[in-house]
């Protein structure tokens, strides 16, 4: 098992095929704004469907507050495309993630089910505009994951700290 990421560490670079063509480069795709990276178990997971649906619903508010979102899983391109269409996902979604690469680079939990094969457990990161981790949520099973309202509140809190530090630094 590799080590999990701590607050303040840079999210390691990941490159995944993206729905719609091209590649999803993380954290680069989110650099310059606060970012959310959602690793979901798969299109078949009801908890993942709920989480993604919540981020889709909150996407206008997240965008207004300068928060970008990206998601990925080990699902094949075809089922990921159907998943994106089903939820009308407006943010970048990667597919066909390599379990070993993701486990080694960011420390996500993995699981193998006879009916589902090998996949990544739900993992979420809130990133600062420079790509460093502000918050990491590692789940070892289906529950325990980022929710949009917490992300919005955390970013507001971080912005408040930054404003306070700036005010205290002024002569």
Label each PLM-derived region with a short phrase.
Residues 1-171:
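Chalcogenol-based redox active-site neighborhoods
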């Amino acid at each position: 098992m590799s080590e999990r990421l701590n607050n303040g560490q840079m999210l390691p670079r990941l490159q995944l095929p993206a729905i719609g063509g091209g590649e999803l480069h993380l954290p680069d795709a989110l650099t310059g704004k606060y970012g959310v990276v959602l690793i979901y178990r798969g299109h078949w997971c009801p908890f993942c469907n709920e989480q993604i649906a919540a981020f889709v619903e909150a996407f206008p508010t997240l965008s207004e507050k300068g928060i970008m979102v990206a998601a990925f899983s080990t699902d094949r391109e075809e089922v990921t495309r159907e998943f994106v269409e089903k939820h009308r996902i407006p943010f970048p979604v990667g597919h066909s993630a390599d379990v070993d690469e993701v486990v080694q680079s960011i420390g996500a939990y993995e699981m193998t089910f006879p009916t589902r094969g090998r996949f990544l457990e739900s993992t979420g990161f809130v990133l600062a505009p420079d790509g460093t981790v502000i918050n990491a949520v590692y789940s070892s099973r289906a529950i325990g994951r980022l929710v949009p309202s917490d992300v919005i509140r955390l970013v507001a809190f971080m912005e408040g700290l930054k404003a306070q530090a700036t005010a205290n630094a002024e002569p």
